[in-house]
Amino acid sequence: MKYLIKAKIEVEGLVDRHDIIGAIFGQTENLFGEEFDLRKLQDRGRIGRVQVDIKHEGTRTIGEVVVPSNLDRVETALVAAMLESVEKVGPYKAQIRVYDIVDVRAQKIKRIVERAKEILRIWSLEKTPDLREVLREISEAVKRAEVIEYGPERLPAGPDVDKSDEIIIVEGRADVINLLRYGYRNVIALEGARGKIPETIIKLAKTKKAIAFVDGDHGGDLILWELLKVADIDYVAKAPPGKEVEELTGKEIARALRNLIPAREYLQILERKFKPKPAVEERPQPPQPQPPAVQPVQPTLQPTVTTVEVVREAKPEKPTVQVEVETFEIPPSVIEEVKKLSGTLEAVLYDSKWNPIERVSVRDVYNVLEKMEPGKVYAVAYDGIVTQRMLDIAAEKQVRLLIANRIGNIEKRPPKVGILTFSDLT
């Protein structure tokens, strides 16, 4: 329907809805010929169902009449005037007055325009041509005006930090300005925090999805190290190695925010980097030398396959230590593909014949494995960390081998899952 005719009705007596509808159709019948009769127009779909909403006040009936119209503007106005020609409902005097004709298409156009603006904004985040150097002087004055001071610490921030369910935490004011330039308005800065994270950031991270976006250098890791210890951060995004957030282009920012790393997983990387390795407490053993819990043997490349031995310590029933050795034959072509995974944040699932089953993002590999039938996946190679959670799902799904970038903190090791790192294959 194109239009909605809205009218008020007053009847000097108590009547029902069907009395009013009958009066409208009866008193307008053939006023302008059979072709413009309301019943005929309704049968042809030119007007919609007449809607009447009434209530009784003392001895009077008042209410509203709504008639949807698919006619043009002139014909719709004529139908509206016909409604006002109704003078009686049953034996009682009545009065109908049209108070509005709503253009349904105008409302629809308004919704379309608003949606188009939203689509353009989202599209611009990733598709904007890299004209930063050309437009820097012009846009700087506009974008600087959007930087606000947030919280008692007066932290530099974008205008949507309060409204958005998600915030992006960066280091300084220059980072905020750069992200605002490309349309990211839910950004807030630590303002060069060292040692003490602002209380405002800690409170925001408790109630919103928080992404920490830092420079791709050692300084960025130091900030993350302090931030992740006190704030409930959900994900980590890093600038490309050697680059700062304030100098990234729109495409580089979008790429970094697509390749998010779970904060808990990145904290394990930082713990290995910044914390001293704890001394390993060993139980008293007979004087015989102890073999390592896991000793990957460097694979020797053969014309067709590579053999990798994974050594595990078996539980001895006697003082003598027994060693269980499992051998994995990895084709050289697979080794080359695994080496290429470094830096991609991707994972490849293989069957027992080393045929690729699926290639997924590292952050999705756990969920993909959860849906797999036990025994279908033989090995998983991924650019990530071997965590306890990953080992547990591998054991549950009968995965025989995990090949990853590095090994995290592991409390309990499943006996039937082998572990190798990328460095073991070089």
UniProtKB/Swiss-Prot annotation:
Cofactor note: Binds two Mg(2+) per subunit.
Catalytic activity as recorded in UniProt: ssDNA + n NTP = ssDNA/pppN(pN)n-1 hybrid + (n-1) diphosphate
Binding site for Mg(2+) 1: E171, D215
Keywords on record: DNA replication, DNA-directed RNA polymerase, Exosome, Magnesium, Metal-binding, Nucleotidyltransferase, Primosome, Transcription, Transferase
Keyword presence, Transcription: yes
Residues that, per the record, bind Mg(2+) 2: D215, D217
Name this polypeptide is given: DNA primase DnaG
Molecular functions per Gene Ontology: DNA-directed RNA polymerase activity; metal ion binding; poly(A) binding
Recorded GO CC terms: cytoplasm; DNA-directed RNA polymerase complex; exosome (RNase complex); primosome complex
Signal peptide extent: none
The Toprim domain, residue ranges: 165-241
InterPro entries referenced in this protein's UniProt entry, alphabetically: DnaG_primase (IPR050219), Primase_DnaG_arc (IPR020607), TOPRIM_DnaG/twinkle (IPR034154), TOPRIM_dom (IPR006171)
